[in-house]
């Protein structure tokens, strides 16, 4: 089924209120697909307990979700202990898929967590959300539970920005607005209807997720959006309005690094390095400068400080994990836990 972005926006945009019945029901869920909720977590002891309490209250009333996983980055702040105390299955990201070495960021943690997910439908959510509510869960899962033709649902929301006592209702999501959306409009205009293309909250059918690769770091969300689109097409994708979502804000320097990874991820999917290299095949421009996709994994960030000018070098590796369904090597499969 082919759809224009306008048709898709009208027909595949939902509101969490459309699925309030899921939040109020008390059935045992035997006839519906099973569900797994995964939280990639790093130093979120201050929020993960409250979030899991909300999830457990929903689970006690409705049976949603069937499985709750926290995959922790060996956080020194006690994130894992808090999560266990609130009833979650807790895994160290470095203990899953050990054949691939230490985990290399959020996307890698998500990929590894998928290996222990049992649900027919898998939902991911950020663990640093300050205003997590039950409708985040049933709203995101709802379209997939209601429509067997859908394969992927992305959360949409308003992103407030709070600085001191000042609050700008739509001031958050700076990487989304300044980098991701312009790139999507330029290279993937069919996906321009997604309000939050970088949202960490999304749900998908596990069988489909097992067929897509995962970028290991900040590129995981935009890379997955593109790869799911290539796998199932726009008509099998949807978004749901969750209202307002507030999470911790990053410094501009960190946002700059994130933006560079989003840019390189789209460049990788577009083969942009090959396009920039003038067809030389060596990955270099006529002047010897590497094409965009062949650029080194370091990101140079020049800043002016009170002490003077400084240039910082950051490692921004763009690593891609293979689809789980493609893994047939006994060593890789036996190292799941």
Where are these regions (language model features)?
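Short, acidic, metal-binding catalytic loop of nucleotide-sugar glycosyltransferases
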Residues: 53-65
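Conserved donor nucleotide-binding strand/loop of the catalytic core
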Residues: 66, 80-108
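Short aromatic/hydrophobic "clamp" motif used to bind/position activated sugar donors
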Residues: 122
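N-proximal low-complexity "stem/linker" segments adjacent to membrane-targeting elements
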Residues: 1-56
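Conserved catalytic loops of nucleotide-sugar-dependent glycosyltransferases that act on lipid-linked
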Residues: 170-265
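A conserved acidic beta->alpha catalytic loop
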Residues: 72-80
């Amino acid at each position: 089924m082919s759809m224009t972005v306008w048709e898709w926006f009208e027909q595949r945009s939902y509101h969490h209120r459309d699925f309030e019945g899921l939040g109020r029901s008390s059935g045992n869920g035997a006839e519906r697909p099973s569900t797994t909720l995964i939280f990639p977590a790093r130093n979120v002891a201050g929020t993960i307990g409250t979030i899991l309490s909300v999830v457990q209250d929903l689970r006690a009333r409705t049976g949603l979700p069937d499985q709750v996983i926290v995959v922790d980055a060996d956080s020194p702040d006690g994130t894992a202990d808090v999560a266990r105390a609130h009833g979650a299955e807790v895994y160290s990201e470095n203990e899953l898929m050990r054949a691939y070495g230490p985990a290399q960021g959020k996307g890698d943690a998500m990929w590894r967590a998928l290996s222990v997910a049992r649900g027919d439908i898998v939902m991911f959510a950020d663990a640093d959300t300050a205003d997590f509510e039950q409708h985040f869960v049933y709203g995101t899962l709802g379209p997939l539970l209601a429509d067997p033709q859908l394969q992927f649902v992305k959360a949409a929301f308003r992103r407030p920005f709070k600085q001191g006592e000042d609050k700008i209702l739509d001031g958050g999501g700076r990487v989304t607005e300044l980098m991701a959306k312009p790139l999507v409009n330029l290279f993937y205009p069919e996906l321009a209807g997604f309000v939050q293309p970088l949202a960490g909250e999304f749900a998908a059918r596990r069988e489909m997720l097992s067929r897509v690769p995962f970028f290991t770091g900040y590129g995981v969300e935009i890379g997955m959006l593109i790869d799911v689109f290539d796998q199932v097409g726009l008509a099998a994708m949807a978004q749901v309005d969750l209202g307002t979502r507030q999470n911790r804000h990053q410094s501009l320097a960190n946002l700059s690094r994130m933006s560079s990874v989003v840019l390189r991820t789209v460049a990788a999917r577009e083969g942009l390095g090959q396009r920039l290299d003038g067809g030389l095949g060596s990955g270099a421009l006529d002047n010897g400068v590497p094409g965009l996709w062949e650029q080194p994994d370091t990101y140079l960030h020049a800043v002016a400080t009170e002490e003077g000018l400084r240039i910082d070098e950051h490692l921004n590796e763009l690593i891609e994990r293979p689809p789980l369904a493609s893994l047939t090597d006994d060593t890789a499969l036996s190292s799941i836990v």
